Amino acid sequence: MDSIGDNVTEMDAFVRDLTMKPYAELEKRKAELHAQKLKLVQKRQQLLRDNYNVLVDYARNQDAFYQLLENSRHDFKELVLHTNQLYEPVKRSQNFLTSISEHYRDAKLMHQVQPQLSSILELPELMNACIERNYFSETLEFQALAYRLKDRFGTNSIIQELITQVETLVVKLTEKLILQLQKPLKLYSLIKVVTYLRVTAKLSEAQLKYVFLYFSWKQLQTSLRNLVPLLDYNNPELYLRRYIQVIRDRAFSLLFQYQSVFGESSNDRLNAAGTVDIPNSTSTSASPFEMDPEGFNNFGQNILSSFVRKLQLEICYVLQKFMPNVKDSTSKFSLLLQLYYCNQSLTKVGTDISIPLSKILGSEWLEMIHSQSSEKQA
């Protein structure tokens, strides 16, 4: 009985070994076994030829054979008496045969779906290639496919490893999308990038707004710093003219993009433009968006107004510092007119800085507004 159990264990190990090997290796093993079979047949035939005399002697000793047969019958009766003892090994053998059948069915199924399995295992590589080439929509399709596999086969170790690789790539995708926000983008591209971030990034809507406005502010500051070589403290007219133009173009563009992407106007958050304090020389050194961790939720409710207030402080600081140095009345009038049109553009996106400007420019700004209003009425 111990021998039978050992044989069953060896057979079970042999079958498990077969099921773990690739199909091509099984074919090779099959060919080797077939060759061994042929050798055994030839060996058996040779043995028959070599033992011919023994067989003849066996035929001449039929009495001994019949006696042996009688002994075999006796042994058979003994075997019948021990049937109950043999039941469990037989049952194990039957279960073993059932297991072989199941393994064969699984192996056959694996062979049939091998091309599909190969494609699934290549998913992280394809996803990474799409990220490297900025094919973001295709990357999200691969991500969705991976998560569908997770929903259906979440307990499978191969799928779990696949999902781990995909989630690592999603982090890489998110980082690359955030890097895209650091570049000047057209509205269509910007909407797509923010939409992708809503899917991939574990960020709230307020955090997305913060990231967008943070990089928008950095882009605006970069454009303004590029104007520094034009600055002449004794005659800053050229610098102010270019400065106002940059504010008009870039600030209008980024606020318009913000409204288009997030569906929120600065009018929704601002109480009145007049609530902005007159800036001083220390205002530009502060962080554009100061907040503490506990106040982040409250900050998310008025993030755009914080950005607009910072923009107002920036404009008012520069005008307060350099506008008095413009002595020529014609040049000053031209700058005020340009500033008026700049404010008109910003007003279209919900940012009116008339009141803060009136506090630092006084009657000159009020006269400009009055004269332009009179011209429109005329």
UniProtKB/Swiss-Prot annotation:
Chief location category: Golgi
Record carries keyword Nucleotide-binding: no
Membrane topology: Peripheral membrane protein
GO cellular component: Golgi membrane; Golgi transport complex
Entry annotated with the keyword rRNA-binding: no
Localisation per UniProt entry: Golgi apparatus membrane
InterPro entries: COG8, Cullin_repeat-like_dom_sf
One Gene Ontology biological process: intra-Golgi vesicle-mediated transport
Disulfide topology: none
Keyword terms: Golgi apparatus, Membrane, Protein transport, Transport
Any Pfam family hit: Dor1
Function: Required for normal Golgi function.
Oligomer and partners: Component of the conserved oligomeric Golgi complex which is composed of eight different subunits and is required for normal Golgi morphology and localization.
UniProt similarity note: Belongs to the COG8 family.
Protein name: Conserved oligomeric Golgi complex subunit 8
Organism annotation: Schizosaccharomyces pombe (strain 972 / ATCC 24843)
Lineage: Eukaryota, Fungi, Dikarya, Ascomycota, Taphrinomycotina
Originating gene: cog8
